Amino acid sequence: IGSRPTFDKMEVEKLLIKRKINQTERVRLLFESGVYADDAIVRYVFDDMRLMADAVKVRTEVAKMDVLSTGKMNINENRLKMTVDYGVPAENLAFDLDLSADADIIGQLQAIVDQAADMGYTINEAITSNKVVRKLATNKGIQTLIFGSVGQGTYVPNERLRGLFSQLFGFGTITTYDLRYKTQKADGTEATHRFYPEDKITFTAVPQMGVGLWGVSPEEAEYGQYNEKSANQYITITQWATPDPVAVWTKATGLFIPVLPDPNG
């Protein structure tokens, strides 16, 4: 008698992400007093839509990379502090790799691949930073495997590293993510952050890792019935005016949640 695999159903609630800014009375007076002659200032003042939309998009990317690197999404902004746990097994997060030049990196990676296989998964990609890739390329054990005993000290090019991974572990896709974004601190100064940590490696067995689920925000719903164009509308821009103080507000809104198709792999 046959049996069906256990059916797993996951329910997620998408998070509303908003960013807004206003054209103050002072800005509007400057514009009406002839600032419009300076194209750079005009772009600075009236590029609010793109800037706010980019801010929402960046926040979704931060959320995705947070989940990809930790199995959790951490929120600590606008007086809201919470953690969304995606249920990644603790044993999948317990590896502390030694990436020094003399370390047995290949043995450590083989242990990860073997554990994934024991759980029924085949790793097909490693996601990391260029800093980690450079450490792999300067590891003596990896250099010896590629160039022989006389090749220690020879830097390993990325294509040779991918070839070695493909031969030993069955996957040759090593994706690096080193983009950065800026946030504004309470004192008005800016801080630069990485989307993906520079000292981590994420091994995946499903091709959909790093994706997210978009939904219809309240602002988008206010525009009317869902239609064909709505299918390609992820971030909604709205504008409105306030009488006192006189200001024009621009707001970008998106409804989004990162998705892990299979937290175990």
Predicted stretch roles:
Residues 81-157, 164:
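Extended, solvent-exposed, turn-rich assembly/linker loops in the middle of proteins
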Residues 1-31:
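Assembly/oligomerization interface modules of large self-assembling protein complexes
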Residues 25-47:
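Active-site-proximal, glycine-rich beta->alpha crossover segments in alpha/beta enzymes
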Residues 52:
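RNA-binding accessory domains that recognize and position tRNA/RNA substrates
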Residues 143, 147-265:
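Sequence/fold signature of self-assembling virion shell proteins
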Residues 61-78:
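Short, glycine/acidic-rich hinge or "gate" loops at secondary-structure transitions
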